[in-house]
Amino acid sequence: MQLNSTEISELIKQRIAQFNVVSEAHNEGTIVSVSDGVIRIHGLADCMQGEMISLPGNRYAIALNLERDSVGAVVMGPYADLAEGMKVKCTGRILEVPVGRGLLGRVVNTLGAPIDGKGPVDNDGFSAVEAIAPGVIDRQSVDQPVQTGYKAVDSMIPIGRGQRELIIGDRQTGKTALAIDAIINQRDSGIKCIYVAIGQKASTISNVVRKLEEHGALANTIVVVATASESAALQYLAPYAGCAMGEYFRDRGEDALIIYDDLSKQAVAYRQISLLLRRPPGREAFPGDVFYLHSRLLERAARVNADYVEAFTKGEVKGKTGSLTALPIIETQAGDVSAFVPTNVISITDGQIFLESNLFNAGIRPAVNPGISVSRVGGAAQTKIMKKLSGGIRTALAQYRELAAFSQFASDLDDATRKQLDHGQKVTELLKQKQYAPMSVAQQSLVLFAAERGYLADVELAKIGSFEAALLAYVDRDHAPLMQEINQSGGYNDEIEGKLKGILDSFKATQSW
């Protein structure tokens, strides 16, 4: 078939008429300076606060400073090859991370990309990293417990679902160990866990992940990682990314627990970004909004009511409340809790667990100082049996601390004082607990009952540990149904009291330790 010139020209005209040029308008700017992960861009007139800016090489920066003729942005990722004169453009989007059940059991970076070598993440959607916390009307009071598995914490400093409880102490006092054991104890509780590691060594995080896997808790946990070698921007954003992943469960009528390990390093990363952006420094060179940095994060941990969940899920989930419980960690310098960041976070949270290096070095682990540790709202969430049995423990320890200080100067003590000192020493010994060995409510209750009712009076101090181990082995073998009943109901009445008394009487009469 041959075409003449007229037909060819007609075909060309038809094609030209059909051709549709799609014009895409985008806001483009030019990098005018690059320094330590912070870039200054000229020409982005319509840029939003917190907007993602597309950089060459499939990377992004986040706009944090909007000035008269330029935009200051932090680069999320490597920045060594960025140079002045490079073209960048606005995306019109704010930062979002993948959320959903598919992230459980995975290790991801701040942007939600997998770093565990197990293939792509199967997410249910994306959520904005920055979100407004639920309002007062959407919240419900805290009245259900989160069991950490530690006798010292669950008895004296109880934590409720939706609470923010600070874990504070010097380095090497067992802060991360306490948080990891709390995650391990949620294996069978139905609470989903998120562990956010900020500014830590990759080897340390690898150990944590391995321990969670060994104890069967990784399948229930999302690990969000921003290592010490990553940019300050990623360390600053990691807690918000982890929080968005936790809110997915909270807003669908489920319970979640999030650990921020630790917020001191996030504050340092934010200080670095702020100083590079030339924001005015304040106390300890932190910027003026460092309080807001943590308050807007921790206020997102809440117990939300059934109406909120129903409205959020558009009626799919009815009659269920959701919660996100936060355990932020703060590292102090030489026990100074009056420094800027520690005082900020203490004032934001609903209580704190204070870990002391003196107690840790004395072999009292967990090194909880019950004198200045407090839970402001957890008491309402404590199980009935723990509430009944733990009151005397706190009193005994308070009296012991007072008398121990006094007894250093007094040589002759009366019998009542000696008994109080002896009881205090034994309770302190009883509250010691090994790492990765969380205890159930029933086991804790039995041990506290023994201390409360004077069953330790004739047990030598050195044998308290073996007494406890033998007692727990005895009840697991011969009284498993009662333990199960206490674990399920958490109740306390005359019948349960009588049974516990009977168990301890028969144990002391027939068993050795």
From Swiss-Prot:
SUPFAM superfamilies: C-terminal domain of alpha and beta subunits of F1 ATP synthase, N-terminal domain of alpha and beta subunits of F1 ATP synthase, P-loop containing nucleoside triphosphate hydrolases. It is found in: Cell inner membrane. The keyword Ion transport applies. Pfam families: ATP-synt_ab, ATP-synt_ab_C, ATP-synt_ab_N. InterPro entries: ATP_synth_asu-like_sf (IPR023366), ATP_synth_asu_C (IPR000793), ATP_synth_asu_C_sf (IPR038376), ATP_synth_F1_a_nt-bd_dom (IPR033732), ATP_synth_F1_asu (IPR005294), ATPase_a/bsu_AS (IPR020003), ATPase_F1/V1/A1_a/bsu_N (IPR004100), ATPase_F1/V1/A1_a/bsu_N_sf (IPR036121). It comes from the Bacteria. One of its GO terms (cellular component) is proton-transporting ATP synthase complex. It is a peripheral membrane protein. Belongs to the ATPase alpha/beta chains family. F-type ATPases have 2 components, CF(1) - the catalytic core - and CF(0) - the membrane proton channel. CF(1) has five subunits: alpha(3), beta(3), gamma(1), delta(1), epsilon(1). CF(0) has three main subunits: a(1), b(2) and c(9-12). The alpha and beta chains form an alternating ring which encloses part of the gamma chain. CF(1) is attached to CF(0) by a central stalk formed by the gamma and epsilon chains, while a peripheral stalk is formed by the delta and b chains. This is ATP synthase subunit alpha.
